[in-house]
C-alpha cells in the first residue's frame, strides 16, 4: 500500500524527511540554505522544523519506532 493512503506510513515518511533534512543541514548547510523558496524550499522548511522542534521530533520518532516494531 502506498504511503499516501496509509496514515501511519505517511507520518513515517514525514518524520524521516524531517530528520534527514536536519541531518544534511547540520553537515552541509549551504546545500539547503540556497533554496529557501519554491519546490526545493520544502527541504529547507523540514530542516528548520527538525532543528527548532527537535525534542518533539525525537519523541515522535521514538513513538513511531515503538509502534512499528511492537504493534504492527
UniProtKB/Swiss-Prot annotation:
Matching InterPro entries: KISH_domain (IPR051523), Ksh1 (IPR009653)
Function as written in the Swiss-Prot or TrEMBL entry: Involved in the early part of the secretory pathway.
Cytoplasmic topological segments: 72
Keyword Transmembrane helix: yes
Keywords, comma-separated and alphabetical: Glycoprotein, Golgi apparatus, Membrane, Signal, Transmembrane, Transmembrane helix
Taxonomic placement: Eukaryota, Metazoa, Chordata, Craniata, Vertebrata
Membrane topology qualifier: Single-pass type I membrane protein
Subcellular compartments: Golgi apparatus membrane
Transmembrane segments: 54-71
Extracellular side: 27-53
GO CC annotation, single: Golgi membrane
Glycosylation-annotated residues: 35
Signal peptide limits: 1-26
Primary localisation category: Golgi
A biological process term (GO) from this entry: constitutive secretory pathway
Pfam family, one: DUF1242
Protein family per UniProt: Belongs to the KISH family.
Keyword Glycoprotein: yes
Protein name per the record: Protein kish-A
Amino acid at each position: 500500500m502506498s504511503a499516501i493512503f496509509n496514515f501511519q506510513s505517511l507520518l513515517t515518511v514525514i518524520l524521516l524527511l524531517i530528520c534527514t533534512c536536519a541531518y544534511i543541514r547540520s553537515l552541509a548547510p549551504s546545500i539547503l540554505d540556497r533554496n529557501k523558496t519554491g519546490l526545493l524550499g520544502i527541504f529547507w522548511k523540514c530542516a528548520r522544523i527538525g532543528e527548532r522542534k527537535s525534542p518533539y521530533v525525537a519523541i515522535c520518532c521514538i513513538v513511531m519506532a515503538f509502534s512499528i516494531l511492537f504493534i504492527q
